[in-house]
Amino acid sequence: MDGRNRRKGLEWHFDLAMSMRGVGWNWQVKNIPQVTPKTKWQFVRTQLSKAFLFYFLFDFIWYNIQGSIYATPSPPPLLSDTVPRQILWTWIPGLESYYSFNMQFPLFSALMVGLGFYEPEDWPPIMGRLRDVDCVRDFWGKFWHQGLRKVCVPLLKLH
């Protein structure tokens, strides 16, 4: 095997090992959204804009959490607050995680496409639309695109 084929084989192996959703492979998970084709630099600009937006939203929520009474060493019980505030403070940590995760993916995808390692179509959105979610199954199948299934299921089958 010459050096070029060996390098191609290593690239192929790395791509396969890192693909949690199988994008572009014969085992791609269902419900990954189809995206309209973009040029390399349109994609990079769009992804960097998304990363900035999600960073701003993450930062906004993080500072609100840090300044809240619930970030103190002895926070009051959540049920002692009004119902609207209970709902708000139940959603805020989830939104913080959502924004944190969605800030990293577009940044990394812009870097990989910008450097020429991948094409824009190799990076469909990491999450779907929340309006497509009606139940827990839809959350994992349509919103999250079964992102952890291929990684976790083999571990669960260990005896």
Predicted regions: what they are:
Residues F101, S109, V113-H159:
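Membrane-interfacial catalytic/cofactor-binding modules of polytopic membrane enzymes
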Residues M1-E119:
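Fungal eukaryote-biased detector of long internal structured cores
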